[in-house]
Amino acid sequence: MAVPKKRTSMSKKRIRKNLWKKKTYFSIVQSYSLAKSRSFSGVSEHPKPKGFSRQQTNK
């Protein structure tokens, strides 16, 4: 015969929920800092040559 599970206490629920929130927060912070570092790293390493963006030929 099936026996119902015991109910999880509110404190355990709160602890687990806070752990889940903390993990997601740190993963968001880490991914944001990685995106920032990647978006600015390419600018300083390989600057774009100036004067080549608008080449026009006179006919």
UniProtKB/Swiss-Prot annotation:
Segments of this protein annotated with the region Disordered: 36-59
Localization: Plastid, Chloroplast
Entry GO terms, CC: chloroplast; large ribosomal subunit; plastid
InterPro entries found in the cross-reference section: Ribosomal_bL32, Ribosomal_bL32_plant/cyanobact, Ribosomal_zn-bd
A GO molecular-function annotation: structural constituent of ribosome
Record keyword Lipid metabolism present: no
Source organism, top-level taxon: Eukaryota
An individual GO BP term: translation
Location, primary (coarse class): plastid
Keywords: Chloroplast, Plastid, Ribonucleoprotein, Ribosomal protein
Pfam families, sorted: Ribosomal_L32p
Sequence similarity: Belongs to the bacterial ribosomal protein bL32 family.
HAMAP family xrefs: Ribosomal_bL32
Protein name: Large ribosomal subunit protein bL32c
Naturally occurring in which organism (per UniProt): Oryza sativa subsp. indica
Gene: rpl32
